[in-house]
Amino acid sequence: MPKGPKQQPPEPEWIGDGEGTSPADKVVKKGKKDKKTKKTFFEELAVEDKQAGEEEKLQKEKEQQQQQQQQKKKRDTRKGRRKKDVDDDSDERVLMERLKQLSVPASDEEDEVPAPIPRGRKKAKGGNVFEALIQDDSEEEEEEEENRVLKPAKPEKNRINKAVAEEPPGLRSKKGKEEKSKGKAKSKPAAADSEGEEEEEDTAKEKEPPQQGKDRDKKEAEQGSGEEKEEKEGDLKANDPYANLSKKEKKKLKKQMDYERQVESLKAANAAENDFSVSQAEVSSRQAMLENASDIKLEKFSISAHGKELFVNADLYIVAGRRYGLVGPNGKGKTTLLKHIANRALSIPPNIDVLLCEQEVVADETPAVQAVLRADTKRLRLLEEERRLQGQLEQGDDTAAEKLEKVYEELRATGAAAAEAKARRILAGLGFDPEMQNRPTQKFSGGWRMRVSLARALFMEPTLLMLDEPTNHLDLNAVIWLNNYLQGWRKTLLIVSHDQGFLDDVCTDIIHLDTQRLHYYRGNYMTFKKMYQQKQKELLKQYEKQEKKLKELKAGGKSTKQAEKQTKEVLTRKQQKCRRKNQDEESQEPPELLKRPKEYTVRFTFPDPPPLSPPVLGLHGVTFGYEGQKPLFKNLDFGIDMDSRICIVGPNGVGKSTLLLLLTGKLTPTNGEMRKNHRLKIGFFNQQYAEQLHMEETPTEYLQRSFNLPYQDARKCLGRFGLESHAHTIQICKLSGGQKARVVFAELACREPDVLILDEPTNNLDIESIDALGEAINDYKGAVIVVSHDARLITETNCQLWVVEEQGVSQIDGDFDDYKREVLEALGEVMVNRPRD
C-alpha cells in the first residue's frame, strides 16, 4: 500500500489560515476546534471577524470570481451551449452592503465550502449567505442545491432570516425584487464553491493523519456511487425543465403557456384586433381523452373586447354533422366568437379543420375557376407528383410506375377528376356564367370576389365551416341556390345570418347568444322562436311570484334587505338540492334574484299617405343603357297604384337597381318617359344610404335640420326605429351600419312618402328589425316597390314577383316556391324538400 502523507501537527495549521489554508481545511479544522474549546457559533464568528482583514476580503473576492468563471465554462460545455458572461461584482457588493447593514459577519462564512456527509443522511442547508438569501429563486439553483451537500449552520441561517424579517417592509420588498431579477447571477458564487470542492478535498486529504486518510478513503468510496447516481439524476433533471416544479407550479406554468399561445394566435391572425382577452377553464381529463373526437366541447370560456365582456363562463357545444345557426342582437359578439374559433384562440380539437369565410380572394390574373381549384392543396400536390413521375417514366425509370399507380389511386379516392366540374357547379350557383368563370379575379368587384371566396370554402368542405352573413353579397337567385345546396351539407356548419327563411331551411339547431351565455335549441329558427317565447313567459311568471313573495315578507315587518336575503336563501337551498340530485361536483354561482325579462322589441311605422288617383307612377316606352354598353331595357311600359306590393327579382347585373333609379327620376331614360302624380312623394332607401347622410352631425341634429323638428320629436322618431337612446347624440360617422340604416328609415318616415322604393333594405338589420319592417310594410297604405334577397320579407309582405330578364320586366305566375323551383331547374339542380324539425 502507498504510504499516507506525513502527519502534521494541528496547531500550526490554524496560523495564517487566510493565506496558506484552503477553505476545505478551515471547515475540517474549525470543527476540531469547536469540539476542544466548545465555543458557541456566534463566538467563533466574532473571533474570525477580528482575524479577517481588508486584504483577505479582496483576495477572496478575486478567488471567488475566478471560481465562478471556471464553473460557468464547465456548465456551458456540459450543456452544449455558451451564454454571455455576466459581471457579478456589483451584485456581490450589494449583498455585502446588505450583510453589513444586518450586522452579519460575512468575511469567512461567505467562502466556506461545506464538507460532504455520508450518503443516506439528510442534507441540511448550510450557512452560505447567498443561498440563504436567494434560495428557490430559479430552477437552475434548485438543481445545484440538490447536487451538493451543505454543512449545517442553522444558527447562522436563523439569525439571517430573523434580521431580514426585522428589516423595514419597504426596503425588504425593494431589495427582494432586485435579488429576484438577478437570481441566476447571484447563485453562481455558491455553485462555484461546490464545483471547486473536489480539489479542496484532495488538499485536505494530504494533510490528514494516515488513519484519518484511510477512513476518508472509505467514506469517499461509499459516497462515490451515491454521487454518480445523483449526478445522473441531476443530468435527467437538467434535460427536463419541469422536473423540479411542484404540481401547483406546473399548473400555473401551463395556464401561462396556454394564455400566451392564445394571444400569439390572435395577433398573428388579426393584428388590428389586439384588444381581445380570452380565458378558458382547463381541459378536463375526460376532454383530454377526447382530443381526437369530432365534436367540440368548450366549457366556461370568457371573451372581452375593448374592456367590454361579451362572453362570461359560456359553454360551446358543437356536434359533428349538425348545422347550427348562431343568433342574437347585433354587437353582442357573434362574429367575435367565429373569429376566435377560426384562430383557435379557444381549445378546438386539433383534428378538426376549421374555416371562416370572411375575406375576398386576392385580385390577380388567376381565373375564378382556378382560384377555386387551387384551394385544394392536396389535389395540387398529387397532380404535381403525377407530372414528375410521368417524366421519370418517359426517361426509362421503371421504378416510377409503381409510385405513379399509387398517386392515381389517391387521385381517384379524392375525386380529382370531378374537381373542376364541382368548382364550376358552385360558381354557376353563385351567379357566375361560363365567361365569368374564366375571367381573372382582378376584373371583379369586391362583392364578386367575395362570392369566389365563398365558392372556395364550399369546394374545400372543411370539417367545420363557418359563414358570417353569407347572403349579404348575394342576389335572390344565388341565395336560393345556396339555401338548397347547404340543406345537403353533410359536415358541420355554423352560420350567422339575419335571414330567417335561410335559417329555417338550413339549420338543424339554433344557438342563442343571450346575457353573455350560449343557449341551445333543437330545431330551426321558427321552433326556437316558439320555445324562446314560452321560456320568457315562464321567467315572467317566476319573477311575478318572487315579487309577490317579497311583498308578503315586507308586509310582515321585514325590511327590503332582509326580504331579499331570505329569498336568496330559499334559492340557495333549491340549488344545492338540485346539485345533489344531479351529482354535480362543480361549484355553481350563487343564486341571484330574478329580474324582469327584457323583451327586445322593435317597431317600424310609416305614416299613411292621402289617397291619390291611379296610376301614381309608371314608365312608358322607356329604353335605357349606360354609355358605351348595350341597352339594359327596351320599351318598358307599366304603371303602379297605391295598393301595389311589388318585389323585383333577377340575377345580379340585369338592372334591378337601375330600374329603381328610373322610377325615382334619378336616371333619365334614353327614350320614353317616367310619369307620376304631381302630388306624389317618393321615399327611396338606397343600398348606398350612407352617402345621403351628413356624417359630422348627430342623428338628432340631422332630423332637426332636415325637417325642422323639435328636439324631443326627433328623438322619438329615432326611438321608434330601434335606435338606442345613447346613439341619438353620437356623430353619424361613428355609428354602425345597422344604426345608420335606422337613421335613414327614420328620415323616410319623416318625409311622409306616398310610395316606398326600397333597394336591399334588410342589409345590416337583425331578424327582429326585419320582422318589424315587414309588419310596417303590411300596415302601410301606400305603394311599395322592393328589391331584396330576403325570402321571408318577400313572402310575409305578399309581394308580386316581377322578374327582370331579356331587357324587359315580366310578372311571374305563381308564388315564391314556384320561382325557387324555376331558378334551380335553370341551374340543373333538384329542389330539396327537407322536413323541418
Swiss-Prot record:
Q: Where is the composition biased (Basic and acidic residues)?
A: 47-64, 147-159, 204-238, 551-572
Task: Output compositional bias ranges, type Basic residues.
Answer: 29-39, 71-83
* Domain called ABC transporter: residue spans: 296-540, 617-832
Instruction: Please list the residue ranges that the record marks as compositionally biased, kind Acidic residues.
Output: 134-146, 194-203
Ranges for the region named Disordered are: 1-256, 551-599
Q: Enumerate the UniProt keywords alphabetically.
A: Activator, ATP-binding, Cytoplasm, Nucleotide-binding, Nucleus, Phosphoprotein, Repeat
| GO BP | positive regulation of translation; translational initiation
PROSITE patterns per the record?
Answer: ABC_TRANSPORTER_1 (PS00211), ABC_TRANSPORTER_2 (PS50893)
Q: What is its main location?
A: cytoplasm
Phosphoserine carried by residues: 22, 90, 103, 107, 138, 194, 225, 587
Q: How is it modified after translation?
A: Phosphorylated at phosphoserine and phosphothreonine. Phosphorylation on Ser-107 and Ser-138 by CK2; inhibits association of EIF2 with ribosomes.
> Quick one: which residues bind ATP 1?
328-335
Which residues are listed for ATP 2 binding in this entry? 650-657
Note the superkingdom of the native organism. Answer: Eukaryota
One GO cellular component this record assigns the protein to is:
nuclear envelope
Cited Pfam families: ABC_tran
Q: Could you tell me where this protein is found in the cell? A: Cytoplasm; Nucleus, Nucleoplasm; Nucleus envelope
Q: Which Gene Ontology MF annotations are present?
A: ATP binding; ATP hydrolysis activity; ribosome binding; translation activator activity
**Gene3D superfamilies named among the record's database cross-references:** P-loop containing nucleotide triphosphate hydrolases
Subunit annotation? Interacts (via N-terminus) with EIF2S1; the interaction is independent of its phosphorylated status. Associates (via both ABC transporter domains) with the ribosomes.
What exactly does this protein do?
Required for efficient Cap- and IRES-mediated mRNA translation initiation. Not involved in the ribosome biogenesis.
Name the protein family: Belongs to the ABC transporter superfamily. ABCF family. EF3 subfamily.
Annotated protein name in UniProt:
ATP-binding cassette sub-family F member 1
Native source organism of the sequence: Mus musculus
